[in-house]
Regions:
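Mid-to-C-terminal polyanion-binding domains and interfaces
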Residues: 3-7, 100-107, 344-350, 354-389, ...
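Short alpha-helices
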Residues: 124, 202-246, 257-266
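A short acidic, amphipathic alpha-helical/loop segment
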Residues: 177-181, 387, 402, 513
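A residue-level signal for conserved active-site and pocket-lining positions in enzyme catalytic cores
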Residues: 60, 167, 322, 518, ...
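Histidine-centered active-site/metal-ligand motif
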Residues: 194-195, 395, 462, 550
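Histidine/acidic-residue-rich, glycine-tolerant segments that coordinate divalent metal ions
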Residues: 169-223
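Long, low-complexity intrinsically disordered regulatory regions enriched in P/S/T/G and acidic residues
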Residues: 2-28
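Hydrophobic helix-and-loop "lid/oligomerization" segment in the mid-to-C-terminal part
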Residues: 25-27, 34-163, 185-186, 237-473, ...
């Protein structure tokens, strides 16, 4: 049984009471202890058998870790956790075809997606090919004008440029028409992907995708870069078998490329379990060596002076690489990650940093307008299960970010649409929309149903995120369909919303030893959430607004011990109002702990997720 399955089973065996009696927090959550009653004996057994502190045992057990799995969770290694790449369907065919390309010195084109996973996957393949003397042509489609995945014109261009082999990464599984163009023109294609697949697959040389329906590898949780890494491992093995190495021909330094795999794994928000934990743990270690010239330049451009963490990957480096695909040149990120020229890398890194600042400005302006419109919609119908709003002044590349913010703020699925400007004033034209959801509402399923019903030009996605294209003339019909499709799920999900708590603590117990202990169970991210602690009945001794949207506080316990904390984007929200309006009365405050370095001094602070007034709980 998998870790998530074990956790679900443990939770279902016994109903839990609200943690500290919090039934309705500032953000509208019921607080629950993450460690289910059925997991408490497992936590104790983990602690005793492996000789680790009880707190660490509780953190591990609460995340579904079994007693025998602890060593591989605390010290994940590629050797122990990566299976033979041949377990993936079509892997041996792909490896042989890549080896052929190397030995024949063929021209190879790499066609990637415009997000971080696509950029990292493209760079991985290009660096591997480059080691073997092949300078790959990287093609990243323009998000606005070409959209996701291969298109016939792009494929035809690559073939005309002389590509003897095209490798698609993080895309291609459902690109039937474009890839048929390659076959018609006599060029082989290898698809390396991780997106959900139909039973029918493109007619190409190989489709390496753990989420194709006939694949039984159990590796569906990998991102595209994770699959790409396994592919170059297999291709290296095939070349070794053919005797390609030796006599001065060295094997590629595969492990030194894991920094790219780690970056993609975190940014694509795939579960940090199993092999993904090894990818990220080892990849962060590689990144600390600053060997990748492009990543080093990006880290310097961002002004980072601390060792990289999963937070660094997801919230500092990832957005900068994505900025090129959102509002600039989509290929900038992939190019940066392949550079060997420090001057050129520094130039592109600065350009991406500038684009990221521009993206933030665009997002802020769009979000302000979207929040105002959404507030009116929710005030008119508090039970509205899905927010759908759009404008012809909004940027296609940023609608997904705004949708995420709306979903976070209003705790319901949202769809943000950027309408084309047709200049006619007739109300005609198409819009490109991005949807984000909450746990318990499968928004991808709803979008696919709307597309099947003929209400959308196209649409698809997965449970938590989806995309669509819709004619303005069909918007109201599509809106009504989608709202009714998610109404039941959204209502149930919002009423059952919980915030999971790992334990209670006071500032006196927060020290380096505790943080070191918590870090042992990392890296944290999707599928392995950062431990969240409650500081119960603490007084807010100091509070101020920071910038335009954040609240900084100092919490004090009954023993006079203190800790600083910050609540991001809390101004104008119930959380900010709670923190700023305690009137000297004690409140419960929940959040995660993080080391912070400022001015040469290191301290531990609380990243505040939620708060609750004990007097308002039943």
């Amino acid at each position: 049984m998998s870790a998530p399955a074990r956790r679900k089973a443990a939770i279902s065996t016994e109903e839990q009471a609200a943690y500290l009696g919090v039934e309705n927090s500032a953000r509208g959550f019921q607080w629950r202890e993450r460690l289910a009653p059925g997991q408490r004996n497992i936590a104790l057994a983990i602690s005793q058998r492996h000789g680790i502190p009880e707190l660490l045992g509780r953190v591990l057990a609460a995340r579904g870790v079994g007693i025998d799995e602890v060593p591989l969770v605390l010290e994940p290694t590629i050797k122990a956790l990566m299976p033979d790449p041949s377990v993936l369907q079509d892997m041996d065919v792909a490896a042989a075809r890549l080896a052929d390309a190397v030995q024949k010195h063929q021209n190879v084109a790499v066609f990637g997606d415009y997000d971080v996973d696509g950029a990292c996957s493209s760079a991985l393949m290009a660096r591997w090919l480059g080691h073997h003397g092949i300078r790959a042509r990287i093609y990243i489609p323009d998000r606005i004008f070409e959209g996701y995945g291969p298109n016939p014109a792009a494929i035809e261009t690559l073939v005309k440029e002389g590509a003897g082999l095209i490798v698609t990464v993080d895309c291609g599984t459902t690109s039937f028409e474009p890839l048929a163009v390659a076959r018609k023109l006599g060029t082989d294609v290898i698809v390396i992907d991780h997106h959900q697949a139909d039973e029918k697959l493109p007619d190409v040389a190989a489709v390496v995708n753990p989420n194709r329906q006939d694949d039984i590898s159990g590796l569906g949780h990998l991102c595209a870069a994770g699959v790409t890494f396994m592919t170059i491992v297999a291709a290296t093995r095939e070349l070794r078998r053919r005797g390609a190495y030796g006599n001065g021909a060295a094997e590629p330094p595969l492990l030194s490329m894991l920094d790219l795999v780690a970056l993609a794994t975190v940014c694509d928000v795939v579960p940090l379990q199993g092999l993904n934990r090894a990818y990220v743990t080892r990849g962060l270690a590689v990144m600390r060596q600053r060997e990748n010239i492009g990543l080093r330049a990006l880290i310097d451009a961002a002004g980072l002076n601390q060792p990289p963490t999963t937070y660094t990957l997801g919230f500092v480096l990832g957005p900068r690489i994505n900025a090129g695909g959102r509002i600039g040149d989509a290929a900038l990120g992939a190019r940066l990650l392949t550079f060997e020229d420090e001057t050129e890398a520094a130039r592109i890194a600065v350009q991406l940093d500038k684009l990221n600042r521009e993206r933030k400005s665009i997002e802020t302006e769009m979000l302000s307008a979207a929040l105002a419109e959404a507030e009116v919609m929710v005030d008119a119908d508090p039970a509205l299960p899905l927010l759908i709003l759009g404008s012809d002044t909004w940027h296609k590349g940023v609608v997904g970010l705004v949708s995420s913010r709306l979903t976070e703020r209003f705790r319901r699925p949202s769809c943000v649409i950027a309408w084309e400007k047709d200049g006619s004033g007739s109300g005609k034209g198409q819009g490109t929309g991005s949807l984000r959801s909450i746990t318990g509402v499968d928004i991808g399923k709803a979008v696919r149903a709307a597309a099947t019903a003929g209400l959308l030009v196209k649409g698809g996605g997965h449970a938590m995120a989806a995309g669509l294209t819709v004619e303005k003339s069909r918007l109201e019909a599509a809106r009504a369909f989608l709202i009714e499709n998610v109404r039941a799920e959204a209502g149930a999900a919002r009423s059952a919303a919980t915030l999971e708590i790992d334990g209670a603590i006071t500032p006196a117990g927060v020290n380096d030893k505790l943080i070191n202990l918590i870090e042992q169970a990392g890296p944290y991210g999707q599928g392995n959430p950062q431990p969240r602690f409650v500081f119960p009945a603490h007084r807010v001794k100091f509070a101020k607004v920071m910038g335009e949207a954040h609240v900084r506080v100092t919490l004090e316990a009954g023993d006079a011990s203190k800790i600083d904390g910050i609540a991001f984007r809390a101004i104008g929200q119930p959380l900010g109002e709670t923190l700023l309006g305690t009137g000297g009365m004690p409140i419960h405050v929940a959040g995660t702990l993080r080391r912070d370095s400022w001015g040469g001094r290191e301290k531990i602070e609380l990243m505040i997720d939620d708060a609750a007034d004990p007097r308002k709980q039943s």
